[in-house]
């Protein structure tokens, strides 16, 4: 591993996936620690000092990156299979353009959802090459949770949102804990 690790590694039957602070993703053999492959993305000049842990699903490992991207890497060789825009960096300054996926993506069936700081919540269809199912403009660094009806997200101000998991429509919003550093659901 080339730099410090800012997120918990993911452990699966294919090995251990580690994401380092310099935006490198490495698959290590669980038995002896040898490197099976490495994937690297360019690092923006400014990003949050936090990282989303990688997540295994099927034949892929999913990793969120600064710049608002969720990337599906093939477990076999680390090749990017698809890339989904969770957020689109925008603004006049470097600080305005920070749009990082810093919470754990959630997976259920063919759906994977992620959220970005200064970005949005987005859900993708893994069986259709990462096609966007829906997105909502809700910024969060706290995280997501998914059940059989709703996707829950705590926004940057501390409001908790329940969104319809199939359409992204708002079902309810609880804002009684604003500005109290509410955790993810």
Model feature map: region roles:
Residues 1-12, 35-58, 83-107, 131-147, ...:
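Extracytoplasmic beta-rich repeat domains
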Residues 13, 20-21, 65-66, 116-117, ...:
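Structural signature of WD-repeat beta-propellers
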Residues 17, 131-135, 142-163:
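Acidic (E/D-rich), amphipathic helical modules within compact regulatory domains
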Residues 23-24, 34, 58, 79:
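Tandem repeat domain/solenoid detector
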Residues 29-33, 74-78, 125-129, 164-167:
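Short loop/turn segments that connect beta-strands within beta-propeller blades
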């Amino acid at each position: 591993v080339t730099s410090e690790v800012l997120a918990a590694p993911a452990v699966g039957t294919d090995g251990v996936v580690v994401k380092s602070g310099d935006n490198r993703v490495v698959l290590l053999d669980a038995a002896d620690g040898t490197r099976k492959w490495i994937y690297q993305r360019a690092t923006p000049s400014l990003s949050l000092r936090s990282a989303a842990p990688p997540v295994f699903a099927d034949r892929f490992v999913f990793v969120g990156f600064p710049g608002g991207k969720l990337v599906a890497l093939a477990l076999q060789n680390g090749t990017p299979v698809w890339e989904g825009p969770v957020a689109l960096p925008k603004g006049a300054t470097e600080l305005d353009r920070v749009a990082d996926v810093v919470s754990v993506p959630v997976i259920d069936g063919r759906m994977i959802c992620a959220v970005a700081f200064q970005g949005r919540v987005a859900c993708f269809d893994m069986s259709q090459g990462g096609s966007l199912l829906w997105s909502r403009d809700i910024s969060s660094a706290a995280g997501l949770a998914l059940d059989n009806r709703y996707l829950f997200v705590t926004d940057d101000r501390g409001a908790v949102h329940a969104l319809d998991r199939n359409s992204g429509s708002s079902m309810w919003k609880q804002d009684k804990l604003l500005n109290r550093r509410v955790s993810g659901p």
